[in-house]
Amino acid sequence: MCSAPGGKSFAAAALMHGEGRIMSYDLYESKLSLIREGAERLGIEIITAAARDSSQPDPDCIGAADCVICDVPCSGFGVLAKKPDMRARVGERIADSELPQLQSRILAAASLYPRVGGRLLYSTCTLNRHENEEQVEAFLAQNSGYSCEQMHTVFPDPDLPAYLRTDGFFYAVLIRNT
């Protein structure tokens, strides 16, 4: 979900050794060529890219997936080193924007797709707790059928990604229990 440009789909395909099927969704049709071209360049045949609004549940996918990667739109504070234009906005209150509400809707829709025992990976490229830990904690409080297997912010010093010229990101692996 929110798959363009396709890096996580490509990594998942490599882990799957060409077995199974990956559905890579993105809101914008114009971004799907990045996924399709990347898959072709890498010789990956198990990826199908399609345009869809990930914040809206797809009845055809409910309970059908072993694993769902939910890489939501975010403020991007973990990739400031790559995006100098964002540095000027660091002081802005991005967390108070509509992003957390959109993230919550996408996570809620994504949570319908794993089978019982399946996994849901929630990820962002931000270090903002409001978009990360707090988002997952709120989801778990409202969804007793899920538990958290692991939750981790990846960056040695969450305050300094731009200065050290490295990226930071967050992920949580959730298990569907019922």
Task: Locate each region found by the language model.
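S-adenosylmethionine
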Residues: 1-178
